[in-house]
Amino acid sequence: MDASVRSVSAHTGRSTSPGLTGLRVALVHDWLTGMRGGEKCLEVLCRAFPDATLHTLIHRRGALSPAIEGMTIRTSPLQRVPGVLRHYRKLLPLMPLSARSWKVGQVDLVVSLSHCVAKAVRPPRGVPHVCYCFTPMRYAWQGRDAYLEGWSDRPIRRALAGAMLNRMRTWDRASAAGVTHFVAISETVRERIGLYYQRESQVICPPVDTDYYAPGSEERENFYLCVSALVPFKRIEQAILACTRSGRELVVIGEGTERTRLEKMAGPGVRFLGWQPDDVIRDHYRRCRALLFPGEEDFGIVPIEALACGAPVLALGLGGVAETVDGAVGRTYATPTAEALLATIDAWEAEGLPHDPALARRRAEALALPVFRERLLGHLSEVVNGQHPAHVPPAPHVPFTSRGQKNVR
């Protein structure tokens, strides 16, 4: 057995899920370094296919749920790179080549969960490959400029990184041809799949644990809340500036590279709690005046958790959040600035804090774990049984070592 196998169980890879009984299944995930929204989707599939082999680039042992850690996990050659678990994002240029090491063997179904290279796995001829797509490769498409910002003070390296991303974009588009069926996490992502890959997809939104995230008996307090990684594209500085300028209280839960900079701009009413466990986050959802969500997300699971706890949500009305948050459960605003967020807070408070907790709860319950499981497994069953014919354009596989195309959208 390969040294990269993290579980030595002699699994057969066969499913015991209704409608999928007896199938040999391979699961593919970009990397396994912690339990985030994507890993919660993966966990559902691991429970449905406990004997499947799980392929990934790298695996941080003990960082995932028992359902995931109990799988047979096969990693790529990147796992053997010293320090990879701390610096894996810097190894982006090596990821397409590493993905070529995935060999799924004789299986009946391949399911990838991808925002980077997982969809590049190649199934045996005639085997359906369903990709649950969090977004097309972020670094090559809509996140390209943000990735290059890290090299703004090094023009030569920035130019080289830009050329690399152009080649990555070409490779990413070609690798999509190995997917027989795309499933998008939101209408926003469905549109990107159509734009970048010229492919149709079905939308199945990610799950929220509405049994855990539920209203409590706590009274609403005066503080606003942000729950987020403290990284640039989350735009947490806009919430901090809006609350600092208006003298409002704000609690920020989360860690990231931006924390020091954000703390310097924050007023006395802003408190940083750092990383917190789920029970602390749930407690703050139950007590906050409202959740502030200034980032543009592919879907946005945090607002749904807040809604499940009965909290209002004031969010930037772009991306996936615009599909779940509206005036009935909070407010949205169109311009990604601190001024626009502050104006939204002022207007909402002037209206008397209108909010319907029961409606917010129902909105979240439509995305509960059992709903997600039923929809996703039902879709997989229909694919396997030929009810969703594949529509794959005749695009050849382009090795990452080839020269990038010009004028790629």
Region spans (language model):
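Conserved donor-binding/catalytic core segment of Leloir-type glycosyltransferases
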Residues: 214-251
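Acidic donor-binding loop of glycosyltransferase active sites
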Residues: 286-298, 311-312
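Short alpha-helical donor nucleotide-sugar binding micro-motif in glycosyltransferases
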Residues: 283-288, 376
